[in-house]
Amino acid sequence: MNSIQLIIDIILILWLLILTVLYLRKKSLNLNIVKNKKIVRAKRYIVFYVIAESKVKSDDLERVVRNSLKDLLGNVWLNIANPKVVTYREDTQEGIISTNRIGYKAVLASLPFAKEINGNKILIVPRRTTGSLKKAKKLIGLK
């Protein structure tokens, strides 16, 4: 009886050892795969203008955009989209929000929820989404 149990134990140990080796080989092969950097870096630029009672500063605008995205979809989507106000012209109240390809729709959906800055009512109106910063700057009248 003990010899049968010993044989079964040895077979199970060998089986687990083989599975462990196969798993570690597969894991090491996956570590060498490089992600497609073009997909990771794909950015979208949202050209927008602001309708407000008074002038709005760029820092306040970025804070409100991030808070509206956080309120609408939570911290997970805030970290995924990572919206940043790249350029903002205070004279014409036009600007560009930079985000990635995955999260630009979430940023667009959250813009109407940005309703006030420092007690002043605002409305952020997206004009166009582009894939290049050069074209976005051209749309707001910069070089």
Curated annotation (Swiss-Prot):
User: What is the species of this protein?
Assistant: Saccharolobus islandicus (strain L.S.2.15 / Lassen #1) (Sulfolobus islandicus)
Listed under subunit, the entry gives:
Consists of a catalytic RNA component and at least 4-5 protein subunits.
Q: What is its main location?
A: cytoplasm
Question: Gene that codes for this?
Answer: rnp2
Q: Which InterPro entries does the UniProt record give?
A: Pop5/Rpp14/Rnp2-like, Rnp2-like_sf
Which Gene Ontology BP terms does the record give? tRNA 5'-leader removal
EC class: hydrolase
Q: What does this protein do?
A: Part of ribonuclease P, a protein complex that generates mature tRNA molecules by cleaving their 5'-ends.
Q: What broad taxonomic lineage does this protein's source fall under?
A: Archaea, Thermoproteota, Thermoprotei, Sulfolobales, Sulfolobaceae
Annotated GO MF terms: ribonuclease P activity
Compartment(s)? Cytoplasm
Protein family: Belongs to the eukaryotic/archaeal RNase P protein component 2 family.
Quote the SUPFAM superfamilies the UniProt record gives: Rnp2-like
- Please give the name of this protein: Ribonuclease P protein component 2
